[in-house]
Amino acid sequence: MKRKWIIAAACACALIFAGCSSDTATENAPEAVEEITITNEENVPTSYDCIVVDGSPEGVTAAISAARNGLSTLLICQDEALGGLYTLGELNYIDVPESRDGTVLVEGIYKEFYDAVGGSGFDVTVAKNTFYEMVQAEDNITLRVQSKFVEPVLEDHAVTGVTVEEDGERVTYTAPVVIDATPDGDVCAAAGCDYTFAGEDIGERDREMGVTLVFRLSGVDWEKVSEFVQTPEDGESAAEGGVNGNLAWGYSTEGYAYEPEDDAMRLRGFNIARQANGDVLINALVIFDVDALDAESRAEGIARGQKELPRIVEYMNENCVGFEKAELVDTAEQLYVRETRHIRCEDTLTIDDVLENRSQEAAIAVSNYPVDVQATKTQTYGTVVGFPDQYEIGFGSLIPQNIDGLMIVGRAAGYTSMAAGSARIVPTGMACAQAAGVAARVALEDENIRVLRDLLASDADIAEIQQLLTEQGARLDHTETHEAVMDHWAYDGLKVIRSMGFADGGYDNDYRLDETVSGPRFANMMNTVVKKSGLALEPRIAVNEETNNEEMLTALAEKVAALDGSAAPADFAASVQFLQARNILDATLAENFADPSATADAASCYMLAARLYEYLLTLPGASAYEAIDRLS
């Protein structure tokens, strides 16, 4: 079914609405865009050149890329519509990767979609139809919807196909190349690929970033919202939010002030996107205690959110300008899940790769995004560890270790948990997915390639992948921007603590290295290091809010003595000698901490913490996590 006129008309409407006031938008609102119903063809082949599992944006991109490169391609969509997080999760607020000079870093198939839906803040139904039309335009794609992945077909540690369930019956499809585009790396996990979960690679397997349930409201006064988010509050020089066409953001004070009935839930600042009919989608409700790999837990999370929402909307009616007459319409079908599995791949993108804007030898994508670690149940606010200018992702991050015939694209690809805070966004996944489709062609054309990982050892094949990507609209130009903080004397120490997820540089990469630290921050830093070493955390290091070098070093020496079985030093001078003897204090740090009544700066504390980590790892029972940096 070809219905391109719907898309063109809807995109035009989206652009028109960007400049309308709320009253005008309501009066002139078009009828809701009609969603295309997708049905499966009967008697389709069971053998293909390439199988892509999942109808996510990354899955659609991988399938289109493979098809355009001449491969017969099967796209398995587990839902009734294409688009995954963008459509069924209704996360229509696209994070556009853009360098500091304003260059959009991801193009190619992603840009085709972006342009077709009218940019960020798209209408969800328009997006569903657009993804379908893009797939239907490719003669080499066979699409199966409501086709549930069951298990991979394995032969000699290689995936050669997948078994799915369609209409209650199991069907097996085969192909020499399978691309896992599921958000959680389900195919890889079922095939036996190694992976870490959440922050496991830095000792935080139980880290629970909240999931989000997007909800839809009618009756929102867009003109009042636009004026409010652009108006500074009393005593402030700038507004907390802003507006851009049919997008708005703000209401952080109001969001965080909401007291939920469900204590495993939180409202934060609002990301607001207006739809073609005048409704708005709100990304603000964060839900905890959801096992994102368990279907029942996800369903329960949605139900909990839906139960809380009438109360939230009533609160918004009373406290949020422009929402006085808002009414709840519905919620997204799926949750926005930020993190689950991280598949171990031949190459791993690290936090230093991201924040040092590094190049990669076999680069297949360039992107950026703040390293965004969202709130947890015990941490009210999310943090931004840093904001890169641009970094490359290597082809090896798409190739799982140990299992052949398989590539992984999306947030579960070969990234450390900290790097994934940046690389997890959908446009980055779409860039990698386009590369996977091209790589499938090159692998099948090269008679010397027995398994996909062999491509990594072939400079000629990598060069061909890069050339084809460029010819097909992808952007691979990259500048390895040098960050000022990299020249700081304490940068090596900062990197260690940053890789633990403790240092927050924010959007401007300012780690406040020259500022003195508070007592609680010093204690939290040192206790974090002890915890990451795997040694006994209790009793914890504790110092006063207004602390000084004497108190800090004495408390630290006492803890180290308890860990290595030594007698605790008697005073400040003895503590200095004690820490020097263990190389925790070197000459520079000894000088920086020399005045007992002064308080050392953050740079010195970061370096002290890094040196503490090195010492603790020499003790019996200590262990190092793979994604935590070490001092060179």
Regions found by a protein language model. Give the residues of each.
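Flavin (FAD/FMN)-binding glycine-rich loop and adjacent Rossmann-like elements that form
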Residues: 170-171, 175-177, 185-459, 463
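Terminal recognition/anchoring or ligand-binding modules at protein termini
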Residues: 23-26, 499-632
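Glycine-rich Rossmann-fold phosphate-binding loop(s) that bind the pyrophosphate
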Residues: 53-57
